[in-house]
Amino acid sequence: MSLSGSFDTMPLPELLSWLDTTARSGRLTIDSLRAGTTLVVDNHRITGCQSSEPPTLLGQFLLFHGAISEETLQVAMREQDRNGRRLGEILLDGGSISAEVLDGFLAAKAEETILSTFDVADARFDFDGDTRPPRGVLPVSMPIHFVIAKGLRRIEETAEAALFLEQRGQLLRRTDRRPSPRIGAVWPLRQAYEAVNGARTVEEIALHVHGTRAQVLQRLYELYKEGYIELATPERSVALLLPPSILEEPLTSINVSAELPSLVPRRIADDATALNSVERYLLSRCDGTKDVRSIAMVAPIRPWEVADTIRSLLSRGLLEVGRRPAG
């Protein structure tokens, strides 16, 4: 039996409960503006998952938890582009991560992929009885009733955190309280703390730390309740100190699409008041040291969106792009 609809008419908890009580087996596909996710269901359990949402992809998930560096991810993804091997295999063979640690992160990634479907309020779904796992699916074994319980708790916790942290006209800044040893020891908590600068929204902070909104809100709320960060009215932005340009022959023409991946973008304007979170994030990465391809490899954004956004920033005079000097 197949079933199609939207979360407006059948919310995710209700949909999963129906799959559980009727002991259905098959594929549940959830499509939103943000991403597409497939869950493989088999007799009261979710046995596989797959998502196109950037923060739930393996490389971004490992960055969020501090398991690898951005430089390591860039090298691995360049090798993946050359030979098509799986990212995990490349990281293992290169000694960047052990098999035991990778297995642990894959299990955690699978759970986050499944639970992140509860972050989506507006989506369409399609369930069919095809039990064959799609290519690239991540195996998992989670009882559906367990997923529903954790998902509902996630919704409540995220809503509570957002109620306190996302106030109109106010942004998060650090307080004078000295960071605890735990903040220094827990990578996602430390990164969330360091990303708070009095000028970034929660969405921007999530981009900088490579996490989902729910993951980041959880860490920020912990920091907020313990007095390490606070809400404040943002002050007038301070002019950005830009390094000297290293670009050879900066290009002023907008028609650079074919060459864009190999070009190096550099921010040349400070006014970011009319920009969205993705634009501000990418502007912060355009420091004249990395080409567009390298930025796209580590950004928690789809590559085409990186390219489109950089083209837009270029056309508005906020960036220059050029070639690296030879040699």
Provide a role label for each language-model segment.
Residues 1-327:
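Acidic, Ser/Thr/Pro-enriched low-complexity segments and adjacent helix/loop capping patches
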